[in-house]
């Protein structure tokens, strides 16, 4: 979701489905891991503009997406505070009908090493993922896609 408002405004009326990733809420983490300035604020503005243009995700009778926003969020190890703030913002600013894909497939690779980023040098735990899903429901989000999870969710 690190898109400029100018670019998004040029696409108004041309795009049917937006699928932005919202990675981090905390400015320090976004600078550390993404190395981009103002990521959280830019992402919030971009996602609000996408939502203004196409609204909530709508499907046809066969379950095929037709139009709307589907927000993706990758749960990261030791970053549940970010996950909670992002989910709270989605529910509050966009509404509980927003379709959210809460992803668990983070895998440390590449530049993520024990020395450089030890705090994210592991997969997320089942408990971290379950807390993310539970919090999404707690703030009123109900259109959740978490079908790829390999463990049973206890509700």
Where does each model-flagged region fall?
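Conserved AdoMet/S-adenosylmethionine-binding subsite of the radical SAM
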Residues: 1-114
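Residues lining hydrophobic/aromatic ligand-binding pockets adjacent to catalytic sites
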Residues: 116-119
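Flexible loop/N-cap segments at domain edges
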Residues: 122, 127
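A cross-taxonomic marker for long C-terminal extensions/tails that follow the last structured domain
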Residues: 130-155
